[in-house]
Swiss-Prot record:
GO terms for molecular function: ATP binding; ATP hydrolysis activity. This is Aliphatic sulfonates import ATP-binding protein SsuB. It is found in: Cell membrane. It comes from Bacillus thuringiensis subsp. konkukian (strain 97-27). The gene is ssuB. It is a peripheral membrane protein.
């Protein structure tokens, strides 16, 4: 078992009282699983991701990664935010290396490997202002994976990109997953993206956020968004939103 999320609940304190954001979240991921999490705005998807990342310790329950209870960020977790968060004064290769020295041959070789994997050959010496948003997000992906984390956590990383760039980065991410078999938890609002990428879809309800349904996705890769089997699964997911009373708050 790579990741185990056990009975996780989360509360926020407000002037009007205590608000429960997450209620009794339980699910497990084996090594190499690709799980997408979808649900209405405000259902706690991003909050759950931050808890798994060790960025939020004020919760009930526990997160176990590779047999170790998580209480803070570590090399076990890679995190990709909605925005790339690159350092503008560092080049592409320096951003990927982050706090590691490119003078170290092992680090330099690893950076070179990831530059090739995310298809940024020739842009190693470029600065963030000199590359596109999609390229910047590829740098963020490479940076998060450089240390070979046990799980990669992605918080709507392609949400702000145009459709063409988003589609391209989906292919880049799938290529990485197929090569490295990194365990991934990917938060998205896009049902098609959830179906296209993952082998399991976790649907959350809101107020408080809890798991409404987990759907296994057994479509073979590469997936065709216009195929009958893809559309049938899309209908199945949409029906869960409708039957669960989620669709009114998800639009």
């Amino acid at each position: 078992m790579t990741v185990s999320i056990n009975e996780v609940s989360k509360y926020f304190s407000k002037q009007t009282g205590t608000v429960q954001v997450l209620e009794n979240i339980n699910f497990q991921l084996e090594k190499g699983d690709f799980v997408t999490v979808i649900g209405p705005s405000g259902c706690g998807k991003s909050t759950l991701l931050k808890i798994v990342a060790g960025l939020d310790n004020d919760f009930e329950g526990e997160i176990i990664i590779d047999g170790e209870r998580i209480t803070k960020p570590s090399k076990k977790q890679g995190f990709i935010f909605q925005e790339h968060r690159l350092f503008p004064w560092l080049t592409v290769e320096e951003n990927i290396a982050a706090d590691l020295s490119l003078k170290d041959k092992y680090v330099k070789d690893k950076v070179k490997e990831w530059v090739e994997i995310v298809r940024l050959d020739g842009f190693e010496k470029s600065y963030p202002k000199e590359i596109s948003g999609g390229m910047s997000q590829r740098v963020a992906i490479a940076r998060a994976l450089l240390r070979d984390p046990s799980v990669l956590l992605l918080d709507e990383p392609f949400g702000a990109l145009d459709a063409f760039t988003r589609s391209h980065l989906q292919e880049v991410l799938l290529n990485i997953w197929e090569q490295k078999k990194t365990t991934m938890i990917f938060v998205t609002h896009d049902i098609d993206e959830a179906i296209y990428l993952s082998n399991r879809i976790v649907i959350m309800s809101a107020k408080p956020g809890e798991i409404h349904k987990v759907i296994e996705n057994n479509l073979s890769y590469p997936r065709n968004k216009t195929s009958q089997s893809f559309q049938q699964l899309r209908t199945k997911v949409l029906q869960q939103f409708e039957h669960g009373g989620l669709i009114q708050t998800s639009i």
